[in-house]
């Protein structure tokens, strides 16, 4: 899958732009804060119907404007896909595939396989379990439609149970809780098994990439931790119901699952250096790329934002060698350093386009 042309209107600081890309390497050069990341986020949004960070749709619209548009043409072998997205203040966003609007945005997930490496990924290591679950959920959802549907059903039941907990009247019967707890139990078990299987299948690829980039004297691991490891969710929800009424929310379930990121048998957030953290995250994302290909998806688009920051020259060199392999398809790389650009272009020897980004204006350098 490659993106051939994109038109952007009023998306973040990009007021207007129409760009055609190389099917291989697209290098975005410019100072920090000029709009390089915003272009990558636009491409990410077209793939996932949401931005890479936690901004609301209204925050994506350019200042003093009331709408934003993303319009792109993709090529997958001999097929052309036209994707349109319209965002308006205080209105529901519109996503269209080949001029036909989606009934559900979830139908779009997986059509444009995409992997993004971003400085914001450090949140997966440094902060709570939500970011780590989101990584796994977005990955699995790209190749497993049943997983995404089941996750939606689970979250709907979770919201209903939380509503009952916040408004628990003495007259409220246990049967009303059981309706939603049964749905959570059934869907939660499916999600648990799929996350467990994913972790087992994903780990070898992850280790392979990490040890290719880094020192083999380090050991890494990825552990899936769930309340369902020892109990059924339906039983847990029943046991915790009275306590949850006091708390006002559901304290147990697959929405509390976590993935332990381990380095030398310790949580990496406690012992990892900035370089080790960055290497860990890059290996995760490159493994995600290969995993999606293994699952039969088109070759993903790879978005690499500020890739070389906090990495020593040795690791940078190894990553460049990896990216130069024919395994990878279309790649977008942002950087402030022209030396990195020259180094990459010399070693990759692929077709490329170079763009200069300044104050939201993007122009190709011929």
UniProtKB/Swiss-Prot annotation:
Keyword Metal-binding: no
Keywords: ATP-binding, Cytoplasm, DNA damage, DNA repair, DNA replication, DNA-binding, Nucleotide-binding, SOS response
Protein localization: Cytoplasm
Record-listed ATP binding positions: 30-37
SUPFAM superfamilies: P-loop containing nucleoside triphosphate hydrolases
GO molecular function: ATP binding; single-stranded DNA binding
Superkingdom of origin organism: Bacteria
Intrachain disulfide bonds: none
Any GO BP annotation: DNA synthesis involved in DNA repair
Cellular component, GO, one term: cytoplasm
Family (UniProt): Belongs to the RecF family.
Functional note: The RecF protein is involved in DNA metabolism; it is required for DNA replication and normal SOS inducibility. RecF binds preferentially to single-stranded, linear DNA. It also seems to bind ATP.
Protein name: DNA replication and repair protein RecF
Encoding gene (name): recF
